[in-house]
Amino acid sequence: MKKHLILLTGIVISCLAVIAQNKGTTLTEKERAGLDHMLSTDPMFAQLIPQFGDPVTLYENFKIDLVRSDSIWEADQERLGVMQNLGVTETFEMVPLIDGISQDSDLAAEPGVSYLIRTDEATILFDVGLNVPDSDPSPLLRNMERLGIQMEDIDIMVISHNHGDHVGGQKWVPQHTFSVTNHQIDLGEKTIYVPEPMTYPGQEPIYSYDPVKIAEGVATIGVIHCPMFVSHVQEQAIAVNVKGKGVVVISGCGHQTIDKLVERSEKIFKEPIYGLIGGFHLPVTESRHIMRYYGWMVTGKLPWATLTKEDVEQYVAMLQDHHIEVVGISGHDSCDWSIEAFKKAYREHYIDLYVGERITLGTLASKLL
């Protein structure tokens, strides 16, 4: 029965994609005027955007991708059922090994993500940072050493999506692989979960499009398609069911969008969604390393009509409406204004994400000794 449903889903999506193309992907006069205005008034956009392709073609493909991704999302949400065997963990500890902000001069920050997650059953490495200097040891490995963490301590690795700031550097992206330093080391007998077909020497990474349990009380929430003007990416997040609390959703970049992360989690888990922690890509203003071009990578948004403060405020209100009790926003892809908006709303229930600072659900943040 499940195979028939999957086949039917594929047929429906294909038909919708054809309908979308038949409606016309050629830019309207208004759309072309918006693109031309951006190219003529924003030198950074005019210089950088051709590196991704012809601007008109990018826009036309983006229009197709929006319809296709929405159709896939609706079909997946209809198809997916509740995970019956998620289980629970009494232990939840998360340590940002790489993130955008560090308050310790001995621990490197960079515009990337790598989180260590400990539960009763497993130690999980979620993403592997950016490695800006392309060095060995990488900032990730140096931070791990200073925190007393070894690669041998890690049982499971999960990659959220194939962007350079999550797979260990841009050079690995076209190869559909990843690395914890500037060359690929022996990872031993780790189980690795990826959001698209990826490889690693000596390993067989597991690609599961649908949600999958990876340890007792821990699962991925499945792949969600994320259409952006300059590219398309598939991203997955991790969910941890903590005893006495509920499900904590941990996101890498949040290209899925906050609303879809919540909707998917509420769809597949019978337990309440307790918290949302990680990267959510909310670059409204320029701050630290968050530059204007970060706004070009917002899912479903045009570079000249990108995320606004009102959008962020709506996300805050949505999480409160859904009774999400704790929130923590990564500084690697969100600006200070967005972080402060969530801090103001959540107050003592807001979790600061600083490199090396341990997060537990008993005490929201304490220094890892």
Describe each model-derived feature in a short phrase:
Residues H4-S14:
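Sec-dependent N-terminal signal peptides
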Residues Q21-D120, P211-P227:
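Zn-dependent metallo-beta-lactamase
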Residues L39-D76, Q170-T181, S287-E310:
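Charged, glycine/proline-rich intrinsically disordered loops and linkers
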Residues P96-L147, S231, E235-I250:
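Conserved beta-strand hairpin/beta-sheet module of binuclear metal-dependent hydrolase folds
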Residues I117, D127, M144, H161, ...:
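Divalent metal-coordination and catalytic microenvironments
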Residues D136-K190, K267-H281:
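Active-site metal-binding motif and surrounding structural segment of the metallo-beta-lactamase
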Residues I156, G244-V248, Q256-T360:
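Cap/insert and terminal regions of metallo-dependent hydrolase folds
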Residues T181-I238, I351-G362:
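Metallo-beta-lactamase
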